[in-house]
């Protein structure tokens, strides 16, 4: 696909009357071609107020983050994988204080482009904490328009026909982000639609690949992670792989980007691969939904085969209701066709039959019977993940390394530890009350399980000082190649051969920076230190309302603003999201 042919991410600004009926307006968006880009933005009318009391009092949200996740990134040169390690419970107020500490705060930046560059440059440095997958909603219950907990689409039949609720799929999830928290390349479970409303806080950057190019992205990912693909042909559903837009562009995969700000809504469409990151502390609410156009996607969605925890929805009720003329063919295994986004020359095949116990898919007690899989260890399920690199990475907290070593590396000779006793129980973790913490120092020690190095403060200050005069500071600690800092070399006389032989380390600015950081001698850098004890307001334990976890070119079309946001890829980098490691590791979405 030529860059001039890449579908543009559209931005819609409906009137209050247009906005009231959610399914009707989504259908209108698709009539304008919004689905071709895989992602669209909706700016709600001013009459729509999802929470009348506002967000000034975080304690009033009455939400606890039962299992925040520490996002540990490994990899280099544009392709990365990420593990999400569960941490101790936090109130939203405590999480906001944590996000404002020097270690986790958003760096100074000129604009979104500058912050994006810093994101990719620092992808492996300081694992952020994400308050992801918090079951619940902070939208007023009497808000009848675009209420994420009840959108009124055909996905409601899962609950109506089977009396099944799937957390985060047909119920709302909350996501509390901080700087650099990431959601990896993925399509939604069962290739559904999704909606994401940013209630408050810092913006969120989104990357998207048009659905018609989704197979091309998969082929590129398979080249970089061949062992993962061989192990599970739906490994991207593990939500732990992030490839930089620069790499995708080199392989002719078109990527567009857009920034979502507080008060704006993002809609993803079936088979639209998307990824992104948060600019700082914020809160988003999200869920999935379905339109009739999705049914063929759902019937032919590729499923993960290496985990019992992946979401699988029975398509029986949808085929019976909306494709009654094909229901018998489908049940007989003769519903021949192709995935809607497969190329025209793709081999025709019959849509998969519903498993015998498919209707019980969401009952946690029945998951293993509904989705039988061969037991595999974490390393077997993620063969491209370099766990040794994580152990050697000086930027990974010691408690995270210890948890991985004790809970993952010991599974080599046996089956995957599926017994509840092998890992902390997730439900039990969600019932824990956050600690009563009075200082930022206590908060940092609490989230780090008390691990600390007395020498880290000095090390952090030294590296922070470098940042002040080194604009191209690169924390991709394993990157073997660095780009020449043309700005530093601009105006200098060319080096002679003799000069280069005397000072080879100075041939590029990034190499000399590596030497200053001890890279030349192989000396690892230490994890950033805890900061000085700044007083914060005591945050009492809050009972959880949940029980689980710019320079666009605009064109107006029929009252709808269309925004062109073809990506100008960042200089280098990439990142990823995690698969599950018992109850220690989980997956994250926007």
From Swiss-Prot:
2-oxoglutarate binds at residues 130, 196, 204, 239. Pfam families: JmjC, JmjN. It is found in: Nucleus. Residues 140-306 form the JmjC domain. GO terms for cellular component: chromatin; nucleus. It catalyses: N(6),N(6),N(6)-trimethyl-L-lysyl(9)-[histone H3] + 2 2-oxoglutarate + 2 O2 = N(6)-methyl-L-lysyl(9)-[histone H3] + 2 formaldehyde + 2 succinate + 2 CO2. It comes from the Eukaryota. It is an enzyme of class 1 (oxidoreductase). Residues 9-51 form the JmjN domain. Its cofactor is Fe(2+). Zn(2+) binds at residues 232, 238, 304, 306. Residues 445-458 have a biased composition (Acidic residues). Belongs to the JHDM3 histone demethylase family. Probable histone demethylase that specifically demethylates 'Lys-9' and 'Lys-36' residues of histone H3, thereby playing a central role in histone code. Demethylation of Lys residue generates formaldehyde and succinate. This is Probable lysine-specific demethylase 4B.
